[in-house]
Design a protein with these regions (language model features):
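Bacterial Sec-dependent N-terminal signal peptides
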Residues: 1-21
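Low-complexity, Pro/Ser/Thr- and charge-rich linker/hinge segments at domain boundaries
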Residues: 24-25, 153-177
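Contiguous beta-strand segments within globular domains
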Residues: 33-72, 173-186
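A short beta-turn/strand-edge loop motif at beta-sheet boundaries
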Residues: 63-67, 126, 189-195
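Extended, solvent-exposed segments with strong compositional bias
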Residues: 93-112
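Ligand-binding face of N-terminal immunoglobulin V-set domains in extracellular IgSF glycoproteins
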Residues: 115-121
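Internal, hydrophobic beta-strand segments that form the core of beta-sheet-rich folds
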Residues: 128-139, 203
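Conserved small/polar residues in nucleotide/adenosyl-binding loops
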Residues: 215-222
Length: 222
């Protein structure tokens, strides 16, 4: 028996309490840190598990002196707290990867260095689906974090999601709200306690500062 979780909600776009670990920049010399699907700067940082999907990481350092930046990937829970799992249970390869591709600015009044890379790669490959925190840090020292970014590894063989956006029945909400009919087919997941294990997070234009967090009850279907 497959289980389908159906949710009807009005998107109020209020901040969710699960927002504990936002994307952040920690060094003042870092500018325009971006992480997105390859060749699509407007996309979220999502890759399919065991696929050839790639993400592009870009950022500028306004200090014109080249530095040794590294990145790491950490599996997180639904609320973006670190998962209590050994790194090598979800990463194949190294725990840190050196960012070796960079170039100095040219024909600009302000000097800076642009760093970029494609990930994941064979040096650091996620082996489990889930929420991942990308950390960029200096000199292989994880205490010198430059910035963090969220990314997602998805497995469509485990669950499928479908959604229909509709106008609210209340005319007073037509211009400010949306009604969402959402179905999550867990297929191979078979959660034991779906009320705790299944969470749905709604984003408005990829924004994390006003997420809508939903908890659902199962509706079994054959």
């Amino acid at each position: 028996m497959k289980k389908v979780f159906t949710v009807y909600c009005l998107l109020l776009f209020i901040g969710a309490s699960a927002q504990r670990f936002p994307d952040a920049v920690f060094l003042p010399n870092i500018r325009t840190a971006k992480l997105f699907s390859q060749n699509n700067q407007e996309s979220m940082a999502i890759v399919r598990l065991n696929s050839s999907d790639l993400l592009e990481l870009h950022f500028d350092d306004v200090d014109p002196t080249p530095k040794n930046y590294y990145y790491s990937l950490e599996l997180c829970n639904a609320d973006w707290t670190p998962a209590d799992v050994n790194t090598f249970d979800y990463i194949s390869g190294f725990t840190q990867v050196h960012l070796s591709e960079f170039r100095p600015s040219s024909i600009t009044q302000s000097r800076y260095i642009h760093y970029q890379t494609l990930l994941p790669n064979k040096n650091c490959m996620p082996t489990k689906s889930g929420n991942y925190m990308l950390r960029v840090f200096l000199d292989g020292d994880t205490s010198q974090v430059a910035f963090t970014k969220r990314m997602f590894v998805v497995d469509y063989n485990k669950a499928m999601i479908s959604a229909i956006v509709q106008q609210p029945y209340d005319n007073q909400l037509n211009k400010t709200h949306q009604k969402l009919q959402l179905s999550v087919n867990t297929m191979a997941l078979n959660p034991i306690n779906p009320q705790q294990q299944i969470q749905v997070v709604i984003l408005q234009n990829y924004r994390w500062d006003n997420t809508c967090l939903l908890y659902t009850s199962p509706s079994p279907r054959d």
